[in-house]
Amino acid sequence: MKEESILKKCDSSSIKHVPSTPLETNCPDKYNPKTWPIRLKVRNVIVISSMTFLNQYGDSVFAPSISNIAEQFHASRTLVTLGATLYTLGILFGNLIFAPLSEQFGRRPIYLIGYSVFALLQIPIALSVNLAMFLVFRFFSGLFGSVGLSNGSGSLADLFEKKDRGKYMVIYFTVLSIGPGIAPIISGFISQSSIGWQWEFWILLILSGFNLFWAFLLLKETYPPVLNRKKFEKYGEIGENEPVALRLTGKQLLIKLLILLSMKKPISILLSQPILICVACTIGSIYGMINLVLIAFSEVWKSSYDFSPGISGLMYISITLGLFSAVFIAMPINQKFYSYLVKRNGGEGEPEFRLPMGFIGITLFEIGILLFGWTARYKIFWFVPTIGSAIMGGGYIMTSNPLNMYVVDSYGIYSASASAGVKIFQLLFGAIFPLFAESLFRRLNYGWGCTLLAFILLACGCSLPILFKYGKQIRNLRPFDPSKY
């Protein structure tokens, strides 16, 4: 392809004679992703975003069919909901394993191997003969499908300078966020058809296989220390202060894997970095709540409004519209405000400049969940609770995107490992909250149940103004040193 030929042509001029100070050249350096042609970067972003989208699509893909699956396997709705919980726990463990492994072997092989297994695992899920088989393979599906989620933000940090990263981070995190909202729209009609809930997973297999084909063709390695290792092995020299990933022996790699599974590294990073604790609590709460609502959403329309499964699935469009509205209206405004703060700060960007939109996002999410809960409680005309769910979806994007970008900007090439600590909280909350959905709304009704959720989020979100005002001082109190982990 054109971009690859440019990289090959410039290889000798930009790499062969690498001094201690980076060489000035107009040619892109194939060992430095930040210098690649924009089209090559965008291709990587599209493939990685698609992987993450389908992983999140799989999270709620069977939500409209929970009752059907429960009936087939002679189980309760809560037990079947474990399929979502275990999937999310699989994503959690995948983040702990695949993010650091990419820092040893590179991003590309981790993406391709993990995603190949994810695609194949849809087969035994669709062919499950009992609930245990369904739940076990759902866990492993989440585990191997997490490669996009665990390494996506790190890949974007590899590809783009901080000043150019914002719009691509918005694309990535938006595609990530809309997956759970789109899946039930399709699955709702499948659940009421005669073809059976299994086709929800056959469709996921087809989509994953198609995306995997393009990943093998288009995805390039982007992790700088691994690229520097390749450069050093080929040319025998690299620039000063350029990080290099060391090759581990089989025994060293096994020890590292055991440490990863113990969660030592991400938990150590999380507990040693106050800003990560604040971000983790906020993102964890809002992610858990959106997962809870997604699981309960279809049942709200069936029980309160007597909608069919297909029409109930269509109601998820309101959440998706809220997500898209936030992307095309709110996030560009946030980027302009970020540029304004950078200009006011003498042209120097700070991670805290990403946060202002988060204040508005949390407020909107709370307004949306209260409006949805109380109007559904009193069975007010169906259009009104959809307004609440749309506001809720927009608030979710406007909160989670700035916070995720804040972590990426704060930790740079180590953002994959830093994000893993945050994702422990996020995914634990996302796994646990849906289990409470049925009992929460049965005991407190939709109005008071959503009010309780709003108060929990309010308590967690109080940290955002503190981070915006004092985040830099807090970061300087406990500087991040990757060698300690």
From Swiss-Prot:
Q: Which GO terms describe its molecular function?
A: transmembrane transporter activity
Transmembrane stretches, by residue range?
79-99, 117-137, 139-159, 170-190, 199-219, 275-295, 313-333, 355-375, 380-400, 421-441, 448-468
Coiled-coil regions listed:
none
What's a GO cellular component annotated to this UniProt protein?
A: membrane
Which terms under GO biological process does the entry name? transmembrane transport
Q: Known InterPro entries for this protein?
A: MFS, MFS_dom, MFS_trans_sf
PANTHER family cross-referenced by the UniProt entry: MAJOR FACILITATOR SUPERFAMILY, MEMBRANE TRANSPORTER
Q: Which named protein is this?
A: Uncharacterized transporter C1348.05
Provide the species name: Schizosaccharomyces pombe (strain 972 / ATCC 24843)
* Phylogenetic classification of the source organism: Eukaryota, Fungi, Dikarya, Ascomycota, Taphrinomycotina
